[in-house]
Amino acid sequence: MTDQATRFRLDIAYQGTDFAGWARQPDLRTVQGTLEEALATIFRCSGEPPSLTVAGRTDAGVHATGQVAHVDLSPEQVALLRRPHGKREPQLAHDALKRRVNGVLGPVPDVLVSRATEAPAGFDARFSALWRRYEYRVADRIALRDPLQRHRTAWVPNTLDVDAMDRGAHGMLGLHDFASYCKAREGATTIRTLQAFSWRRDAEGVLLGEVAADAFCHSMVRALVGACVEVGEGKLRPGDLVTLRDERQRTSAFKVMPARGLTLREVGYPVDAELGRRAEQTRGLRTL
């Protein structure tokens, strides 16, 4: 970020069904690519559009109601946003940014900016975050299987023991190496602090898994859910989740669940005065 640039926070929601994930990829429709194309249209960019930095790089098919990103805009771009449009009075830049991005995305988009604000000093959508909270939906034999929810719910044929799943999930909390539940990436740590993990049934009998951590490694949430489903089916005991975790290597004892059941619900940040300090702390490598 240059000294003259202004940073904006964008709160974003999307249905991930038709996206190849968040991250921009050549010749594939992604959330980042779609939003950056909208920015390029607004600012008439002939080269690289303003780049988005995101709190959580969701995989293909994963949804979000509470994704957070930031974008740095030049003084000229901010002035363009503030410029009166038609009969409108001069606009607040953040209001105009939200309105114009959503205008480019169309009347019935599968991604939109739900809020735009000028970011406080020190804010970084990725590194300032304290936690990310996800929800996973599973319909089993006794749950209502609603065709209208098929794009955001995983289905399993058996009846699941939600109490056993909840006990297994609770035992996973804390700072640990989750290599057994992560897809390996060279140079990336698999040490995470799991802050919340629980299971319950909603009014329609659908199982809702809620999981929060300081950060998640690749496929970690869906692997954790897959292990819990094995517990719910009686194929694993609740305590086996900890045993598998402590082995620190991928196993065939459970399957990674489908992306469609997963939604990023919320990203949490500290008070404004702590944003910069949190970002510096997070950039350091996690250790046990």
Curated annotation (Swiss-Prot):
Question: GO molecular function of the protein, one example?
Answer: RNA binding
Binding positions for substrate?
Y134
The protein's annotated catalytic reaction(s) are: uridine(38/39/40) in tRNA = pseudouridine(38/39/40) in tRNA
Taxonomically, the superkingdom here is: Bacteria
What positions does UniProt annotate as the active site of this protein? D59 (nucleophile)
Q: Enzyme class, one word?
A: isomerase
Q: Which PANTHER family match?
A: PSEUDOURIDYLATE SYNTHASE (PTHR11142), TRNA PSEUDOURIDINE SYNTHASE-LIKE 1 (PTHR11142:SF0)
Q: Which family does it belong to?
A: Belongs to the tRNA pseudouridine synthase TruA family.
Q: Partners and quaternary state?
A: Homodimer.
Its protein name is tRNA pseudouridine synthase A
What is the originating organism of this protein? Answer: Leifsonia xyli subsp. xyli (strain CTCB07)
Q: In the UniProt record, what gene is named as encoding this protein? A: truA
